[in-house]
Structures are given as structure tokens and as C-alpha cells.
Amino acid sequence: MEPISERTTSYSLIHMKNTTSEYDVIVIGGGATGAGTARDCAMRGLKTILIERLDFTAGATGRNHGLLHSGARYAHTDPESAAECIKENMILRRIARHCVEDTGGLFITLPQDSLDYQDAFVQDCLKAGIQADVLDPEEALRLEPAVNPDLIGAVRVPDGAIDPFRLTTANILSARMNGANIMTYQEVVGFVKDKDRICGVRLRNRRNGEESVVYGKVTVNACGIWGHHVAELAGVRINMYPAKGALLIFGHRVNNMVINRCRKPADADILVPGDTICVVGTTSTRIPYNEIDHMEVTPEEVDLLLREGIKLSPRLATTRILRAYAGVRPLVASDDDPTGRSISRGIVCLDHAKRDGLEGFVTITGGKLMTYRLMAEEATDLVCSKLGVNRPCETAEIPLPGSEPDAKDEQRRQHIIELSTEQKAAEGRHGSWSGHIESKSDADDALVCECEQVSVAEVNYAIDELHVHNLINLRRRTRLGMGTCQGELCACRGAGLLERHDKCTQRSIDDLASFMNERWHGMYPVCWGETLCEVQFTSWLYQGVLGLDHESPEAVPTE
């Protein structure tokens, strides 16, 4: 397979210096929606730049339960969103197959729930175009042995699991392949205006404080809940509803199918398998805007998630909790609902020229991870209409990088080639692009992260080609540090490789401390039993043996 650098001008996602060139479109936000919008714009021939204040997936995209929604959860309360979800579900299975696992899903009815609700649920699913098969409890237990054996009813739906980190990275790569420029760690601090038109953005480099300006004909605000602040900088207002959702990650994959509670949407009503773990969630609590960058999972939320999660699968009662985390849903407020659950998950695409008299500014928000591609299509359609460009959207047909047809698939089916465990793991993460991971020596085959089977060769590939500048970036691209030991044994190895590549943007000892503190931040709310033992050993290893606290006493979690 030819080297990446020979197939295009540059796949390396580089920072840019001050520029006076004008783009057709500036996309603000490096989550799935922003990455998808940059991809769509670039594929339609627009001169595109994407700007992200931190790293890709640092916001809500990297803080969800990784559900490939069938839309069934919304069939009763939000049929429009349900129909969007099932349509996008089928598209993502085609274009993002290396990001998707077809687990199937169960909606279970427990003795305290109502079978009448199940009957209505099935009818609502069918109306939305979602396949919903009623199963007897025995069949449900046969399909998913981890499900609560006390269930009195079950419905099978086409749910699945999707990795938001891989999905976003693939969209970024596709955008770059089609000519887009990418800027990370660049925060929008203001806009350049010409009367009632936005014609550029003012940026501050979060690493060195350097300021710059990027000019564009149209700017797309794809910042999720942070879009509220970006809109205010532009002089307009969006009434966003910050709804916090807390989740727990368990150290083992106890279930192979997604398990949902068949009742009206409530806290802790879903258990999603993913890679080597499973995730239970979520809660829904309105929080102030000043907390969206500093969310904490409370003991009460942990207790609730564990208590209700055990009702989905009793095996969770004896399974170690790895960590807790929370994300913020980018909902557009429409009423005074105290939980935000009645607010539509539908897509909101705002043309601020029509709404506020501000030309050259578009906001795409609402929706969810499942509908990111459709959101990007709607935003790009609007941008193209403003620029007089008449090119159709092709993102539903053209596979993402890593999901293209691969000759190795057939060879493996015919047992012509066999892969090692780490090669299979890398293929699961990078799809057909795992062929770009070059192992030139036995040293390249050595494992950096034993929990997730991440090799030196894969780390080298990620550092060189996937815009990695610190350990947190590396975690999002490879799953290094996301396994049972939470970076205990692999973080120092990864830091050494970053230093060797001269890609670490801060002293490697500080980067290592920041990474371990970021891991600690998620472990602290569930720090008892086996997790407490693990934390104590990690602390002894890094502080007592490596002297990390002496070298970097002020280190805090940082991007």
C-alpha cells in the first residue's frame, strides 16, 4: 500500500500560522457535526477550514454512550427524530463500517413496567420505519444471557454500537483528503464584521497566546452547547439548554446486545457494549453555562446509575466500575421542562441572515451523534445556497477513510492471511487504513498498551498521521490508557514515544502528569474496591517510583 504522503498533498493535520487568505467556509467546532460539515463542504469543492479550540471530540462527541441509535427510544415522544435516526443508522452501517458494531438491541419490560407501554412502543416504532420484533422472555435471554432474567417482555430493534472517536477522526481525514485545512487549539475570541456581515474570525492559540485572523465568506457555528457563547460573540442569541448526562464505564463487557428499558425515557435506562467495556447511562440535569467545561459526576448520580443499571443486567453488581464521566446535550430550549427530556432531539439549522439580519453566519445544533451527517448536509446545503454552488451531497454514498472496500476482507474469509491479536485490534480501530501501520522491526510489534493491544507501530502511525500532540490526543486516536489499568502501565511508554517523535507540545513529564490526572478525574467518583486498589498502586508507581509529584507538583488535567 502506498504511503499516505504520496496519495495526497498532506494528510498530516497541521497547525496554521497567521493567514490573510479567504475561505469559502469557516467551520467552528471539532466534534462529529463540525468534522462532518467540513467533510461535506470540502467534498462539494468549497475552500474549507475547520477550527477547534481543543482537540477533536473533546466536547459532547467524546462524552456519550456510543449508541448506534435505531431511533426506537424516541419513537413515542419524538417521531421525527426517530425517523432521522433509523435512516442515518442504515447509512452509517455502509459508510462507517469500521466505526460500527452491529450488536442489535433489546427493549426489556420488567415487572414494575407496563406491557401496555410495550404494545404502544412497537406500534410507534413501526410507524417511524423502525423494525421492532416482539420476543418472549426466554428468547431474549437466549440472545442476551446478561439481561435481567425477571423480564416479562422484550422487543428487538436494530440498535448497535458506534465509536465517536473513530467516526470523527475519519471525517477529519476525509475533509483533509478533499482539501480542507484544520486548526486545533485555536479559540474563537471574536469576529471580523463588515456592517451586518461576518467576514472572518479572530483566534487565540491556546498554547502560546498568539492571535490571528481567518477570513471566510460564510462561517458555520457547529460548537454544540458551546455554540451559545460563539453566537453571543457574533452578536446573536441562541436559547440553548445545557442538559448534563452522567454515565458509568464498567471494566468488562457484560452484554453483547444493547439493553434498553422499555418505558418512558428516564435516568439510567440503557446499557451499551463497546470494545472491551460497557457503558450505563444516562442522567439528565440542567446545569449553568459556567459548569459546562468543569463537570463533576456526583455520588448521587453514581448511586442512581448503578442502582438502575443493575436492573438492566444484574451482572453489573459484581463488575468493577472503571470510571464516571458526563457530557452536555446541545438542546435548543423550547419550554420550561426541568429535565430537558421533552425537548426535541431534532436538528436546528439557523440562517442568521433571515433570523437576525446577520449575513455570513449559520448555526447547526440540536440533533445527536447519530444524525451528525444529516446535520452536516443541511448546514452545507445552506452554505452552498449562499455561495451559489450547485453540487449534491455525496456523504451518504462515499465511505469514510477506513471503511472503503478492502481486498484483505475476502482474503481473511478464505483464510489466506492471518492477523495477530494486535493487528486485529488495530484493524478494528482504523479499518482498511490499518494497512498504513508499518511494522519495520520486532520493536515496532511491542505493545505499548496491553489492555487495548496498542503496538508501537500503531502509536507511531497515530503520532505521524492523526494529529497527535499529547497523550490525551493519543488516547482518543488509539484507546491507549482506556483499558482496565487506565494508563497505569502504558502512559509512561506513550510519553516516551511522543518525546522520541518530538511531537509533545509540552514537557513530557508535564504531559504525563496531565494525562494521569485526567484519568484520575474519572476514577475519583467510583474510587472504591478494586478501583481504589488500582489507584493506590498507580499513585505509588508514578509518585513513589517515578517521582512524578516532585517533578510536576502543579500539574492539572489539560488539553
Question: What kind of feature is each model-predicted range?
Answer:
Residues 1-25, 40-44:
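Extreme N-terminal leader/targeting segments of oxidoreductases
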Residues 21-23, 209-218:
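Core beta-strand elements of the Rossmann-like FAD/NAD(P) dinucleotide-binding domain
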Residues 5, 108-178, 183-184, 190-197, ...:
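Flavin (FAD/FMN) cofactor-binding and adjacent substrate-gating region
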Residues 164, 174, 239-246, 252-254, ...:
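C-terminal catalytic lobe of FAD-dependent flavoproteins
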Residues 221-235:
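Flavin (primarily FAD) binding-site architecture
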Residues 42-62:
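Glycine-rich FAD pyrophosphate-binding loop
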Residues 66-143, 269, 410-419, 534, ...:
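Dinucleotide-binding Rossmann-like beta1-alpha1 core, especially the glycine-rich loop
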Residues 25-49:
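N-terminal Rossmann-like FAD-binding beta1-loop-alpha1 element of flavoenzymes
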